[in-house]
Amino acid sequence: MIERGKYQSLTMVNWNGFFARTFDIDGLVTTLSGGNGAGKSTTMAAFITALIPDQSLLHFRNTTEAGSSQASRDKGLYGKLQPGACYAALDVVNSRNQRLLFAVKLQQVAGRDKKVDIKPFVIQGLPSHVKPTDVLIESVSATQARVRQINEVKESVAQYEGVQFKSFSSIVDYHAQMFEFGVIPKKLRNSSDRSKFYRLIEASLYGGISSAITRSLRDYLLPQNGGVKKAFQDMESALRENRMTLEAIKTTQADRDLFKHLITESTNYVAADYMRHANERHKKLEQSLSLRSELFSSRETLIEQNRLLNQVQQELEMLVESESALEQDYQGASDHLQLVQNALRQQEKIERYQEDLEELNERLEEQSMVVEEAQERVLMAEEQSTVAENEVDSLKTQLADYQQALDVQQTRALQYQQAVQALEKAKVLLSDSTLTAESAQALVAQLTQSEAEQTQALLALKHKLDMSSAAAQQFENALKLVHSIAGQVERAEASRYAKAAIQQARSAQQVVQNENQWRAQHRDLERSLNQQNQAQALVAEYQKAHQVTLDDEVMFEQERERHHAQLDSLEIALEENRELRSEQRRQEQDLQSDITQLQAIAPKWIAANDALEKLREQSGAELADSQSVMSQMQQVLEQEKQLSQAKDKLAERRSQLESEIERLASPGGSNDPRLKGLADTLGGVLLSEIYDDITIDDAPYFSAMYGPARHAIVVSDLSGIEEKLVELDDCPEDLYIIEGDVDAFDDSSIKAEELEGAVCVRLNDRQMRYSRFPVIPLFGRAAREQRLELLRSEREEVVEKHAKAAFDAQKMQRLFQAFNQFVAEHIQVAFAADPEQALVIARDKRNQLTRTLAELEAKEQQMRSQIQNSKQALTMLDKLAPMMAVISDDTIGERFAELEEKIAQLADAKQFLNAHAKAVEQLESQLAVLDADPEQFDALEAQYQSADSQLQALKKQIFALSDLVERRHYFAYADSVDLLSKSSELSEQLKAKLVEAERTRSRYRDELKQQQEQMNQYNQVLASLKSSYQAKLETVQEFKQELAEFGVSADEGALERAIRRRDELHERLHTSRSRKSEYERTLTSTELGMKELAKRLKKVQKEYVELRTFVVAAKAGWCSVLRLARENDVERRLHKRELAYLSAGELRSMSDKSLGALRLAVANNDDLRDALRLSEDNARPERKVLFYIAVYQHLRERIRQDIIHTDDPVEAIEEMEVELARLTEELTMRENRLAISSESVASIIKKTIQREQNRIRMLNQGLSNISFGQVKGVRLNVKVRESHEVLLNGLATQQEQHKDLFETARYTFSEAMAKLFQRVNPHIDMGQRSPQVLGEELLDYRNYLELSIEVNRGSDGWLQAESGALSTGEAIGTGQSILLMVVQSWEEESRRLRSKDIVPCRLLFLDEAARLDAKSISTLFELCDRLDMQLLIAAPENISPEKGTTYKLVRKVFKDHEHVHVVGLRGFGQEQKPKSEAQQMIEEFEA
């Protein structure tokens, strides 16, 4: 690692108080400690004077004068010196371990100004053991010494081998030497640099934040950059070249823009209107066809609806008439039903009352029987009670009279015997041995009934016999009854006829009894017959509707199955039709989507096709597919590359020629423009200028003789040239300098020998140079002019070839660009199928699908109608289903006729009964009279005798049985027989019997009483029943009378017939009303539809007539427009197919926009302006075509035939584009130089700014952790001024926007920069500065930056570093940090100027360090240690010498002589740094 150079010591000779004092400078901090006036400031002044020996800058003052503008006249230096020679010397060891003694000799100059003469010098290579005082002071004796003069010093130094002494006549040279050896951080080229350095040292010395430095931080921290000036020169040259090209481009652009603008706008203006008329004509034709189709269809629909309306009206009239009759019938049926229902209710009442009567009659009979039984029981009870009473009385009598009792018992025994006899007699008469007394009573009843029958028969015979014998009149009456019934009959037949009449009456009764059954059958058959008639009507209606006759149930089932199958098939077909329609609609939507897509693609395809055709014309290739386009594009690219390479070679050759011409045209013909400046700097003349007048024949010789030195600089004296050459910053690698008289140059010093075609030059005894004559000599003006003439001729030829090659290359490049643009924009669609043909096909398919959809809808409507018919048929069949059983039954009529006959018989029977019922009833009672014919009396008498004998025998039996029954009580007297034999026991038995008899009597009395009470109750019930029966009977008679008044038949059949008729009429009426409502709705809707249709028909007819008139009228105008366009060959330019897909509004908008642009474009051309004004008449579209033709004719006249070889303005635009591209390319090449120059200006400034920002950021890192009092850090902020940043952006990226500044001859580049700055920052006042001055300032990047210093102080954070905001110690520490940053910046800036193995010394000062506290001083020590810096401070006596080296200064006065006593002390807290290997080797060598 390279070590930093260090100050080793400061030697002061003959200063006030210091005759010969050397202060060793510590590697860290050197402290000068002492009281006031001890000499601390003097010591520092000596150091600074040796460092900056410029009296115009040196001004040593104390801190009280820090802000004073006026100070002592000697500026603090004169008074610090003793008379005579004085020295201040700095002993330095640099990074190369070279010992250097930089010193200044100072001597007071007598006079009022108190000036000091300063002469700097340097001693290099002084041995380490030799002290500076050894060469500056000469010892006269052991106690006396003398200050040597500078010459003596030089002589003294000369005694040391290798030691060099060098004095300097200028401070610049002195500082250049110091910079070269790494003593100062910056190269001080002039007084400004020295002033900056001195200000830094002064600020360091007095401490604090120097306003002089902080205000000029940019000058201190930011180095200059000469690259901008170079960029400025490049830009100025590029601007000059640009202006000529720009004028040519502007001319071509003006023509191109005029052609392009007029063609584009006129084409848009006329073509938009042209295509709008074409589209409108096409649309009007389609619209007229559509209106005509609609008109015809509307007429047919109107006729159909009118026919339907008339039919509906007729049916409605018929329906209204039938509905009125139906309403009357329905009302009558409702009234009849009401009567039948009332009659039925009355009949129900009668029947209910009759039932009650029958029930009352039954109850009455039952009650009568109950009463009779009760009477019998009462009689029996009375009889038993009487018997019991008699028995008791008898027993009492018998007990009272025993003989009587005995007689009674005898009587009873006799009665018992008679009863037994009677039983035996009865058994004999009846021949029944099982007969008993108990069974005799039942048998008596049977025989009594037989007796009654036989008695009746006997009485009848007796009656007949009596009648026959005594009542002939009765026979006549009965015969009359027979005659009234059967008419005149024979007397013998009267009985037969009477019986027949009675039989007929009985038959009639039976017929009447069958009335209900027959009526029910009649109702059923009538219902069946009605069903049959209704079914036949439905069959007829079905046959009328479906042309099918339903003969039987088989046919019915077949028809039902057919309709079900038809329904299923229709449903399936309807679903298929619906799916098919959905599919057709989907296809229609797809087609519509395809049409929309094709319409969207069509303009792109048309544009692509046009571009493809244009490419085919330009390239001459077929370009059948994309592959051929790509291959042709590759061929064009290769051709363009070949042409571009040829053009580039020509351009390169042109550049070479121009460079050579420029070089040859320069003074001396030097190929390096820097030589002229160097010649001026060195005070010489170019050798080529001296030989400028030689002849062309001598030019080869002299050119070969001087060889590489032909561009040498001739100077009058070589002394001092080396020093000047060292100061050169920029010079050629080889620079030849020849000493000679410029006015009378002599080449005799060159030992040259001319050979054949060459020159041999002997440089010295060991070197020689052989140079052949150049083929093209350039030495001398004559040779250069000859060469220039040839080069210029060649350049013209090359320029012409380059222009042609550039034109061809540009044309090929435009062709490649056209290919490239085609590939980028159109290749995807160019080779696709023609969308217009696809559109025609798609539209045809869509129309076909529309027709198919209409057919499908009609078919669906038809199927729905068939489905409806089938459903109606099935409904009719469902109605017919229950009736089909009767429709084929032919017997219903016969049975109904038979029942009608029976009903008629019933009527006859009722009529017979009504007529002869009473007669038959009388006749039936007198029928026997007719049988008893007087002629038959004997037979009747014999029959009577026989019947009487039988009756008598029966009576005997009954008598015997009755006697037995009467004597049945006597069987209880069986014991009386025994009592007769036991008379003794008779009394006791009688008493017992009496008791039993009394008990029996009591029981019989109770029973009698109960039976009498019960009979009374039964009699009461019987009386109430008779009363109820009578009342019910009267009510029934009244109800029958009321029922007779109704005049209707009150039976279930009548009600059912009435309800059925009422319901049938109601259904028919409801159906009629529904049909009427439907007809009325149909009528209303049809009338409304006809009105709307008629209105629409009128409107359509009117529109059609108007549209047809318009179409016919427009056709003639369109034909004239079309003929005019074809005759003038503009149809292909006006008929833009892509415009056909735009709406009329879009086309009109396009035309209007173009019209506005054309008005401005042709404002200065009377002919075109008049033509445009005439073309604005929309009623005359041909005038727009005439305007387009006029524009074309005008443009043909404007074509520049010198550069364009066509009469077509469109092709002329293409050629102008090529020419413009060629000129633009030239401009671009120059603009690239301009852009590169301008961009380089901005780039250099930006990069420099960025580099400096990074460098300052690195500097900040070293100061971020320092601490002085409350200050915890120091940093430097750098930012670009906003106004200048806008300028940089405008300069770098907005060149096109600011061309008017940089491409005009009115402004230089600096002025253009100033104008640009004013343009982008209009708010900034420029003051009195001229644009040139401002522009030069803007070329300095440092003016773009703003620098500020901030400190991190306490709770305030980062704030601006100002002395007023900081304490004294904080300000001093901050100031030292800032100065250290400046020093570091200078070192970085000057690194490229010095040797890489040199690291400069770094030292600062600080006077009156007592203003810092111990912590701040410690921070300074640490800062010096960290940054490898040396610090020289003057401190009071209270500074502790812990680190560094401390010198104790005490000024002592001895008589008239002052002396500063110095005691040196190295800090005890300082660590000894390890010595480097070089230092150890030097110490060992010196030892």
Curated annotation (Swiss-Prot):
Keywords: ATP-binding, Cell cycle, Cell division, Chromosome partition, Coiled coil, Cytoplasm, DNA condensation, DNA-binding, Nucleotide-binding
One GO MF term attached to the UniProt entry: DNA binding
Subcellular location: Cytoplasm, Nucleoid
GO cellular component: a single term: nucleoid
Annotated signal sequence range: none
Region entry Flexible hinge, spans: 667-784
Cystine pairs: none
Annotated ATP binding sites: 34-41
GO BP annotations, alphabetical order: cell division; chromosome condensation; chromosome segregation; DNA replication
Short name of any one Pfam family annotated for the protein: MukB
Coiled coil (residue ranges): 297-426, 460-666, 781-806, 836-1111, 1210-1266
Comment block on domains: The hinge domain, which separates the large intramolecular coiled coil regions, allows the homodimerization, forming a V-shaped homodimer.
Summary of subunit composition and partner proteins: Homodimerization via its hinge domain. Binds to DNA via its C-terminal region. Interacts, and probably forms a ternary complex, with MukE and MukF via its C-terminal region. The complex formation is stimulated by calcium or magnesium. Interacts with tubulin-related protein FtsZ.
Family from the record: Belongs to the SMC family. MukB subfamily.
Function, in words: Plays a central role in chromosome condensation, segregation and cell cycle progression. Functions as a homodimer, which is essential for chromosome partition. Involved in negative DNA supercoiling in vivo, and by this means organize and compact chromosomes. May achieve or facilitate chromosome segregation by condensation DNA from both sides of a centrally located replisome during cell division.
Protein name (record): Chromosome partition protein MukB
Organism: Vibrio vulnificus (strain YJ016)
Phylogenetic lineage: Bacteria, Pseudomonadati, Pseudomonadota, Gammaproteobacteria, Vibrionales
